[in-house]
Amino acid sequence: MLCENCQLNEAELKVKVTSKNKTEEKMVCQTCAEGHHPWNQANEQPEYQEHQDNFEEAFVVKQILQHLATKHGINFQEVAFKEEKRCPSCHMTLKDIAHVGKFGCANCYATFKDDIIDIVRRVQGGQFEHVGKTPHSSHKKIALKRKIEEKNEYLKKLIEIQDFEEAAIVRDEIKALKAESEVQHDDA
């Protein structure tokens, strides 16, 4: 079977393309999948070719982001590509990352942190913490961790209003909770 994009090479990969409410499967050759074919915009930016080493994963990541954004009524193109911010290390933009399907280097995570958090929050309906199922053995640990975090926030507020006596009591409670947490960790 010939590649559905270039009609020149033998098709080797099956790619699912999702746009609006329509999912379409395409059979493409390795050349088209890797972005070396003229129909692919990545060919215009050869310095980013090194970031395209695992194309099947890249397609999957890109498709997941596009699907989730579309499902929740978000125009992924508009949200993701508002500005052309570049990573100081690898010089990739958010558009390049979405096109390739993965980050170019470790600094990309810090550079695009706010943009990615915004997209994930919109897709997840405002939730940024895991709220799904957890193993029963973890319930006590998670509850204890949350209690320590709440006490730390309360301690900061007490220090801000200079209620040092109450802050000392809360500090001691936090120490006790941390000790309890370490005991549970050692038992596990």
From Swiss-Prot:
Positions occupied by motif CXXC metal binding motif 4: 105-108
Domain UVR: start-end pairs: 145-180
Keywords: Metal-binding, Stress response, Zinc
Cited InterPro entries: UVR_dom, YacH, Znf_PARP
Keyword NAD attached: no
GO biological process: stress response to cadmium ion; stress response to copper ion
Keyword Zinc: yes
Motif CXXC metal binding motif 1, residue numbers: 3-6
Membrane spanning residue stretches: none
Upregulation: Up-regulated by heavy metals such as Cu(2+) and Cd(2+), but Zn(2+) and Co(2+) have no effect. Forms part of an operon with ctsR, mcsB and clpC, which is repressed by CtsR.
Gene Ontology MF terms in the entry: cadmium ion binding; cobalt ion binding; copper ion binding; DNA binding; zinc ion binding
CXXC metal binding motif 2 (motif): residue ranges: 29-32
Gene3D superfamilies the UniProt entry points to: UVR domain
Pfam families: UVR
Motif CXXC metal binding motif 3 mapped to chain: 87-90
Miscellaneous section: The mutant where Cys residues of three CXXC motifs are mutated to Ala (Cys-3, Cys-6, Cys-29, Cys-32, Cys-105 and Cys-108) is still able to bind Cu(2+), probably via its fourth CXXC motif, but loses the ability to bind Zn(2+), Co(2+) and Cd(2+).
Role noted for this protein: Activates the phosphorylation activity of the protein-arginine kinase McsB. May function as an important molecule for oxidative tolerance in various types of stress including that of heavy metals. Binds to Cu(2+), Zn(2+), Co(2+) and Cd(2+) via its CXXC metal binding motifs.
Oligomer and partners: Interacts with McsB and CtsR; the CXXC motifs are needed for the binding.
Protein name: Protein-arginine kinase activator protein
Native species: Staphylococcus aureus (strain NCTC 8325 / PS 47)
Gene: mcsA
